[in-house]
């Protein structure tokens, strides 16, 4: 129903007003606001009443609310004094509940109190309010009664709405190491200037990288934990805080983080992580015709052979881990990215524009089908796997645990910790991010099985924006960002293994031919 059908409105569209907090569970305060729209609504008894669409100054448009006429006041000096009085009461009430001043949790209150005249006192507020109109007096009495009740009870807030408000005001930053920033620039240069593509499927895919990181993280956490009992040797036996694990040492949180990265990557890759020149390649490698299902008998035979021979802890049979070197193309080696390249810093964006089709692939230029073979020599293993193998030998056939005992004997409080820690490490070393039967043989594998570190790194450019649209408590967000930081350090430490220049090839050689599709385990 429109606003021009005879009903008289006290306020009009576009007028600057003061409006009460629309949520009855929150503190009774007045906000600076503006009327966006006016309509005729109905109350609970079906009577026609005016309703106003209110925009609160400084708030996101998503917080615009419809309010009844009795929730809106004119922008006058008297109502401004009432606004300041309610703001002071609300802040005092929050302080009395033990909340920090910097976390006032009342948007708009700080700006109201900043404009408070120094000579204005509570007594003057009472005197000025007593001379107001009858309508204002009635409102003042109701507000005073409600304020008195609120002062005796703790302010209750809806956690979900409060978290959303805080997230809108929070800026999330993920620091990317310098060596990885340069990798992002080189990646942009190779794709957009040199018209190269990352050869797919990657030799070390994202599943392998994430699983390797969890094992790397767990091993480092366990070895650093060995020193902890020495410093807490004098703690009393009854103290149960010895079981506390900091977020940056928590393996379960690390597993949740990498699983979240996997899910986020699979979803966002086609939306925001591909350059326009890569769109056609993505459609090809994710088609059902590109990958052929593996025969169950061949798979079981291959895995049984792998189980009989010792292997590094991070070479997981469930993920593609080819040891074939990149095929030579006959072209000169790809040069380094030129400096001061203006297009090398362009941002990632989604585009429906397809890149130009490759020239026809000849049989001689088609990449051979890589075969899974066992890592029987250290020369075929990346530096990361060699490093972890030397640091933590895994005796899969031996019942003796990994030696994790500190040099000094600990107290009885920590006597049972070593066995538990050893079991946890052995469990983590056999842990897999996805089950063996995923993805099903009749379905194309998800992007995390095909793409590698080059595209995973791009995700961290977009993560602050993605996280800004999610609801996290301050504590959980801080822990998550800490784990992101540790993971980026891991990528930076082994960037020579994860980001080889040979990964970028000509567009016509950027994927295996459909005649010889690459096996996905």
Curated annotation (Swiss-Prot):
Residues 150-166 have a biased composition (Basic and acidic residues). Expressed in many tissues including liver, pancreas, heart, lung, kidney, skeletal muscle, brain, and placenta, with highest expression in skeletal muscle and heart. The modification Phosphoserine is found at residues 309, 311, 367, 400, 407, 411. Residues 139-149 have a biased composition (Acidic residues). The modification Phosphothreonine is found at residue 405. Residues 114-166, 298-409 are annotated as: Disordered. InterPro entries: Chromo-like_dom_sf, Chromo/chromo_shadow_dom, MRG, MRG_C_sf, MRG_dom, MSL3_chromo-like. Non-catalytic component of the MSL histone acetyltransferase complex, a multiprotein complex that mediates the majority of histone H4 acetylation at 'Lys-16' (H4K16ac), an epigenetic mark that prevents chromatin compaction. The MSL complex is required for chromosome stability and genome integrity by maintaining homeostatic levels of H4K16ac. The MSL complex is also involved in gene dosage by promoting up-regulation of genes expressed by the X chromosome. X up-regulation is required to compensate for autosomal biallelic expression. This is MSL complex subunit 3. It comes from Homo sapiens.
């Amino acid at each position: 129903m429109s606003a021009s059908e005879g009903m008289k409105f006290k306020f009009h569209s576009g007028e600057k007003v003061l409006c009460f907090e629309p949520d009855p569970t929150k503190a009774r305060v007045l906000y600076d606001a503006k009327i966006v729209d006016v309509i005729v609504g109905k109350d609970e008894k079906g009577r026609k009443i005016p309703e106003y669409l209110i925009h609160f100054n400084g708030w996101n448009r998503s917080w615009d609310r419809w309010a009844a006429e009795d929730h809106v006041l004119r922008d006058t000096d008297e109502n401004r004094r009432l606004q300041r009085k309610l703001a002071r009461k609300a802040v005092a009430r929050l302080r009395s509940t033990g909340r920090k001043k910097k976390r006032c949790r009342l948007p708009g209150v700080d700006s109201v109190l900043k404009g408070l005249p120094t000579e204005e006192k509570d007594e003057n507020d009472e005197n000025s309010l007593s001379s107001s109109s009858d309508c204002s007096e009635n409102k003042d009495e109701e507000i005073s009664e409600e304020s008195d009740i609120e002062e005796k009870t703790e302010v209750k807030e809806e956690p979900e709405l409060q978290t959303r408000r805080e997230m809108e005001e929070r800026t999330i930053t993920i620091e990317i190491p310098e060596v990885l920033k340069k990798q992002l620039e080189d990646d942009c240069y190779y794709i957009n200037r040199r018209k190269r593509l990352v050869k797919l499927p990657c030799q070390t895919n994202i599943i392998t990288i994430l699983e390797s990181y969890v094992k790397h993280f767990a091993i480092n956490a366990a070895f650093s934990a060995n020193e902890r009992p020495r410093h807490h040797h004098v703690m009393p036996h009854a103290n149960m805080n010895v079981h506390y694990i900091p977020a940056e040492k928590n393996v379960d949180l690390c597993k949740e983080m990498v699983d979240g990265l996997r899910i986020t990557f699979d979803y966002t890759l086609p939306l925001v992580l591909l350059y326009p020149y890569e769109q056609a390649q993505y459609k090809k490698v994710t088609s059902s015709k590109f990958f052929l299902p593996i025969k169950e008998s061949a798979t079981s035979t291959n895995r049984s052979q792998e189980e009989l021979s010792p292997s590094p802890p991070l070479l997981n049979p469930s993920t593609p881990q080819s040891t074939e070197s990149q095929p030579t193309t006959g072209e000169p080696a790809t040069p380094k990215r030129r400096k001061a390249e203006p297009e090398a810093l362009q941002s990632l964006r989604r585009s429906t524009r397809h890149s130009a089709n490759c020239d026809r692939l000849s049989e001689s230029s088609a990449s051979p089908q890589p075969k899974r073979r066992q890592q029987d020599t250290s020369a075929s293993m990346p530096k990361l796997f060699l490093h972890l193998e030397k640091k933590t030998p895994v005796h899969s056939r031996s019942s003796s645990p990994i030696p994790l005992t500190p040099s000094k004997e600990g107290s009885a409080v920590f006597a049972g910790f070593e066995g538990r820690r050893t079991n946890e490490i052995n469990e983590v070393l056999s842990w897999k991010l996805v089950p063996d039967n995923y993805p099903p043989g009749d379905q194309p594998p998800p992007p995390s099985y095909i793409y590698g570190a080059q595209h995973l790194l791009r995700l961290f450019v977009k993560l602050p924006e993605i996280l800004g649209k999610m609801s996290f408590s301050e504590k959980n967000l801080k822990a998550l960002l800490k784990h992101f930081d540790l993971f980026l350090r891991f990528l930076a430490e082994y960037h020579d293994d994860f980001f080889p220049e040979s990964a970028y090839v000509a567009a016509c050689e950027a994927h295996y031919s459909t005649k010889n599709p690459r096996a996905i385990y």
